[in-house]
A protein has these predicted regions:
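The feature marks proteins involved in alpha-glucan
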Residues: 1-19, 45, 52-144
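Short proline/glycine-enriched turn/loop motifs at strand-loop junctions of beta-rich domains
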Residues: 25-31, 67
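Short beta-strand segments in beta-sandwich/barrel cores
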Residues: 31-32, 135
């Protein structure tokens, strides 16, 4: 795992062929670090200073890293923070179990950008034939 120059946009995590780019908005006067953990393990694995900034956007990229094997958070002025642009969380797998970000129990996970849609496409239903409703899915299925 090596640190290389990152790019500021888009914010969040971007996975490319051979590197992962991290980008987050942090006020200039605050110190920011990237925390890397091995997936499923409690202890911090590596820590990187995020010194490169474009305005208030800090960025860093890592090469030689397998996304499925790692998780991440940020340390901003001594406070562990989950990425506000995170696509998936680790540590929230069980409903109602309280965990704390400060204890490194909740972290960002990496999602693969590749998904095989197997020829799926949008439904071609005329609007006047649609029956639509909304509900809170997690609350609706909580006791199922």
């Amino acid at each position: 795992m090596r640190e290389v120059q990152g790019y500021p946009l888009p914010l969040g995590v971007q996975i490319s062929e051979n590197k992962i780019n991290f980008s987050i908005a942090v006020p200039i006067e605050k110190k920011c670090q990237l925390l890397i953990y091995r997936a499923g393990r409690k202890r911090l694995y590596r820590q990187f200073e995020m010194e490169t900034a474009v305005g208030e956007v800090r960025c860093i990229a890592l090469t030689d890293i397998e996304p499925a094997e790692y998780e991440y958070n940020y340390l901003i002025n001594g406070e562990v923070v989950v990425d506000p642009y995170v696509q998936a969380l680790a540590g929230r797998e069980h409903w109602g179990v309280k965990k704390e970000t400060a204890r490194h129990e909740i972290r960002g996970r990496f999602l693969s950008q590749e998904y095989d849609w197997e020829g799926d496409h949008t439904l071609q239903i005329p609007y006047h034939q649609v029956i639509a409703y909304s509900l809170h899915v997690r609350g609706f299925t909580r006791h199922a």
